[in-house]
Regions:
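Conserved ATP-binding subdomain of kinase catalytic cores across diverse folds
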Residues: 1-82, 100-111, 115
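Short glycine/proline- and charge-enriched loop/turn segments
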Residues: 19-23, 88, 134, 152-155
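Short, glycine/acidic-enriched loop or turn micro-motifs at the edges of active sites
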Residues: 77, 120, 137-139
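AlphaC helix of the protein kinase catalytic domain
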Residues: 81-90
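Conserved short alpha-helix within the protein kinase catalytic core
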Residues: 91, 95-102
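Conserved catalytic-loop position in the HRD/HxD motif
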Residues: 112, 117, 122, 134
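Activation-loop N-terminal segment of eukaryotic-like protein kinases
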Residues: 125-128
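C-lobe/activation-segment region of protein kinase-like
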Residues: 131-158
Length: 158
């Protein structure tokens, strides 16, 4: 990951590597993690889940095959990871995180989504909000049973 600024705004660039020739072949028939993260951030924003604001995704190609990719999103500002909270943390921050998590899980269930890697490091806490990050594992499920199993795994992982 890298941080940069442009025209007074701060951005984060997350790189996804292509690890092998087989990985390149798989990417020929599927979306890259950067593209998927961009899609997930847009979907979550649309349904009211607070996440990083997506700016762009970039895909490198060579000989017609996809390689590395980058996901660019707005920097969240001064934030701490949820796993940095402790018993001495501000109770308002803890309440904010828990309230946001419940709201997000309800929204995800109603719209058929699961996160795929829901855990404390994937929430950033700012002075005004809790922000869900690391969206490359997000899935939208067509069947209620699959969605319920995936959401149960998300909750258990926490």
């Amino acid at each position: 990951m890298a941080e940069t600024s442009f025209d007074g705004a701060r951005y984060v660039i997350k790189r996804y590597n292509c690890t092998s020739p087989l990985h390149r072949l798989r990417l020929a028939v599927s979306t890259s993690r950067a593209e998927h993260s961009f899609w997930a951030a847009r979907q979550f924003t649309r349904i009211g889940i607070v996440t990083t604001l997506p700016v762009a995704w970039v895909q490198e190609t060579s000989w017609g095959l996809r390689g590395r990719s980058w996901f660019v999103y707005e920097h969240t500002g001064d934030a701490i990871r949820a796993d940095d909270l402790s018993d001495e943390s501000d109770p308002k921050q803890i309440d904010q995180l828990l309230g946001t998590m419940v709201k997000n899980l309800v929204q995800m269930r109603e719209h058929g989504f699961s996160h795929g890697d829901l855990k404390p490091p994937n929430y950033l806490i700012t002075s005004s909000r809790a922000v869900m990050i690391d969206l490359d594992g997000v899935r939208q499920h067509k069947h209620a049973r699959a969605r319920q199993r995936a959401l149960a795994r998300d909750v258990a992982r926490w």
